[in-house]
From Swiss-Prot:
Pfam families in the cross-refs: BTB (PF00651), RCC1 (PF00415)
Chain coiled-coil ranges: none
Gene name in the database record: Rcbtb1
Locations listed in the record: Nucleus
Signal sequence region: none
Protein's organism: Mus musculus
Protein name, per record: RCC1 and BTB domain-containing protein 1
Organismal lineage: Eukaryota, Metazoa, Chordata, Craniata, Vertebrata
Tissue: In the retina, mainly expressed in the inner retina with strong signals reaching up to the outer plexiform layer (at protein level).
Ranges where the BTB domain occurs: 370-437, 470-499
Tagged with keyword Transcription regulation: yes
Free-text function comment from the UniProt entry: May be involved in cell cycle regulation by chromatin remodeling.
Amino acid sequence: MVDVGKWPIFTLLSPQEAGSIRKACVFGTSANEAIYVTDNDEVFVFGLNYSNCLGTGDNQSTLVPKKLEALCGKKIKSLSYGSGPHVLLTTEDGVVYAWGHNGYSQLGNGTTNQGIAPVQVCTNLLIKQVIEVACGSHHSMALAADGELFAWGYNNCGQVGSGSTANQPTPRKVTNCLHTKRVVNIACGQTSSMAVLDSGEVYGWGYNGNGQLGLGNNGNQLTPVRVAALHGMCVNQIVCGYAHTLALTDEGLLYAWGANTYGQLGTGSKNNLLSPTQIMVEKERVIEIAACHSTHTSAAKTQGGHVYMWGQCRGQSVILPHLTHFCCTDDVFACFGTPAVSWRLLSVEHEDFLTVAESLKKEFDSPEIADLKFRIDGKYIHVHKAVLKIRCEHFRSMFQSYWNEDMKEVIEIDQFSYPVYRAFLQYLYTDTVDLPPEDAIGLLDLATSYCENRLKRLCQHIIKRGITVENAFSLFSAAVRYDAEDLEEFCFKFCINHLTEVTQTAAFWQMDGPLLKEFIAKASKCGAFKN
């Protein structure tokens, strides 16, 4: 859970103001500016207001939050900022707004005039639904839902990807080798740009003096170039620090390259790397990585919930990933980043909203006031009929007077294992699932049987994070069997991306005939067997 109170600037707010925050971002050269969205979708800013970056219509700093009427009710989805700073955001409707520093046309309005208030970025984006934005020091990028990528602003090193070093005053589609490809994730270093395709391929362009493009050399690139060293890897997240890059594959493997003056690559040395190198090899599967173009800090979160940090951490150079006591990567930047900015738009939850939920959680499997027990594999789980009836339609029907179970104090369960059924009952009390991917398959079966659609989605999420070459076909089979279309497509893509390896596994040869034929036919349609 993100706690905005860990950022010093938010201590200026009253408890009531801080308690209303649902989204937030801290930015600026010294982390002296902040923007936040309240639970009723009002947008406020406060801080130094350097280069009009607060968007209040004037250049006055303020310790008291000011409302940005132009953005209230817009439902901000993605937000990024530059070094000027300038601010760029997109709404849930895909509309892009920008304001602040504009000395290099990074606001995309065709001028170099400061943007004193939020203004919609229209050129080439008016008919696009933008789903993600990213900012470098003085350039900007916007990713559309159809996979098209647009860039503009400062272009001294080719970071806009236009093929020249002339500044780009308005959004321009990044073409060349990306022309017919679909981009799904973007990131900016200070003067470099990175993109991930739906195929898992990675492309980079712009400044490369520290090897941050991962091309094996340090020559700048004026147009996108594929990171060939990641061939065979399917990357699903990429982030950039000031002059280094981190990439996370669909197998939970972490790669780093670029500048390493502060140990931000986590290799155990301070030598720059011109090509991607795997780090955290001995650690458990990584599920999230974090970096920010304003800092030389890196962070990662593993499947077990452990958060690591390395690089420049409060003046120290941490050259290997260091295990922290934080629960999220955002806390690393709040407490150890220099400056203490946000690496992404924060999503905030508050414990005071969980009073009832926490009470229910405490009573799960507590025999004191329970009125029902489930017996699975010789073990008991204590529950409350009222809670089960409220939370699950299956139990609501079961505990009607005409069901035998309504009169029982102990119900025997033999079609599901103890860990699976316990996780299900615990979910009814906590709305969360805590299971390894292997057991999540059984829980997916239960969720399908009990028509618990949200539980199915949670199981699919766990399974996706635990997919490997060895279990990919087993998970694909389970997804088909339990009619989990999203999971089926995810597993299918994973199998295609690692086709040679997964076809050598036992799970592949254990697939039943009809399903195997269906897989081969589908793989053939997407060109998996072309020479």
